[in-house]
Amino acid sequence: MAREKFERSKPHVNIGTIGHVDHGKTTLTAAITMAMSVFSGAGAGKKYDEIDSAPEEKARGITINTAHVEYETENRHYAHVDCPGHADYVKNMITGAAQMDGAILVVSGADGPMPQTKEHLLLAKQVGVPKIVVFLNKKDQVDDDELLELVELEVRETLDNYEFDGDDIPIIPGSALLALEALIESPEAKKGDNEWVDCIYSLMENVDSYIPTPERDTDKPFLMAVEDVFSITGRGTVATGRVERGVVKIGDTVELVGLKDTTETTVTGLEMFQKTLDESVAGDNVGILLRGVQKENIQRGMVLAKPGSISPHTKFEAQVYVLTKEEGGRHTPFFPGYRPQFYVRTTDVTGKIESFVADDGSASQMVMPGDRVKMLVELINPIAVEKGMRFAIREGGRTVGAGVVSEILA
């Protein structure tokens, strides 16, 4: 059977459920897919157990269990990621295996914010999830409305602590389980038929309006990491790689950033699969012919970018997940002063880990396999670094950690 064509009639947004274990993330995900199936043939409703048996994925050699579902609202098409285990969230958010343009934080009205609620919020902040909408679940288990209001206040305070806009964020109370049961009983339930199903509609209306449509990759400033370089006699030097974002046209001025002093050059030709192009866009694997650049002045690990859009750095702070030995990581802890390779985009750069910081701000002296930690890194060579950039930490050819840049220092 022929594959269905992916119809791009609505803007696409990546979203995920986050929150403490057993607060109802997967149940809510199931309820959303069932309620939203009225808007589309896309993403027929998924039952709880279809979501919970999440397949394993490998991102940078790390095994992550994530479940992907899709659904549509009146205004948008969503790809929704739900992770069964807490460790999966940590790995997913740090490796960016499933990018999130926004998140639904699920908090049980019976318990209020718990340790993982806070840990997921901290991670969401540091990996750059821009906006969050809250679903206050298990409302049916709270008899007293005042208690629910207290929990809501506590949630808003917690959001403020992690620099999300606690006053402004929509918080929708409801019961994912009762909504799901109502939808299983009458899958045709529309808005106004059932108070619990209405909570799901209300949640998604808030997600539609509060979580911004992400800027498309093609609208961002041009960037391509250089993978290979060769010279064509009589024509000049060609740098090849995959365009990470933006658009590049013949005649554009671009900057070569990283490893050496930043220089400017002009694009004189573009080729893809032996054909010439006038312009190349995000996602293309392309060869870029550059004017007046010697082959020895470009090397793998540099980037070609729109002038002024990215600069070379050597010092940054990052949130890192350290692989367990079962995942192929180290068997032993490491300490400040450890000098592994940092694999960024297309190249390894040696760097020194100067210090580690725990979530509460205290300095830790040692990092164990399986830990998540904030670290201060100094690279021996400057490379193009920006906030939110992902990297892997390697040692002797194997990945021992994955990280995301949270702050640039120098």
UniProtKB/Swiss-Prot annotation:
GO terms assigned for molecular function: GTP binding; GTPase activity; translation elongation factor activity
Provide the E.C. number(s) assigned to this enzyme: 3.6.5.3
- Record: residues binding Mg(2+): T26
Q: Which residues form the tr-type G domain?
A: 10-215
The UniProt keywords, alphabetically, are: Chloroplast, Elongation factor, GTP-binding, Hydrolase, Magnesium, Metal-binding, Nucleotide-binding, Plastid, Protein biosynthesis
Gene3D superfamilies the UniProt entry points to: P-loop containing nucleotide triphosphate hydrolases, Translation factors
| Positions of region (G4) | 137-140
Which parts of this chain are annotated as the region G1? 19-26
Localization, UniProt: Plastid, Chloroplast
* PROSITE patterns in alphabetical order: G_TR_1, G_TR_2
The record's principal subcellular location, in a coarse class, is: plastid
Q: Name one Pfam family in it.
A: GTP_EFTU_D3
Q: Which residue ranges does the record annotate as region G2?
A: 61-65
Please describe what this protein does.
GTP hydrolase that promotes the GTP-dependent binding of aminoacyl-tRNA to the A-site of ribosomes during protein biosynthesis.
Which family is this protein grouped under?
A: Belongs to the TRAFAC class translation factor GTPase superfamily. Classic translation factor GTPase family. EF-Tu/EF-1A subfamily.
HAMAP family recorded: EF_Tu_B
Instruction: Give the protein name, as stated in the record.
Output: Elongation factor Tu, chloroplastic
Q: What is the lineage of its organism?
A: Eukaryota, Viridiplantae, Chlorophyta, Ulvophyceae, Oltmannsiellopsidales
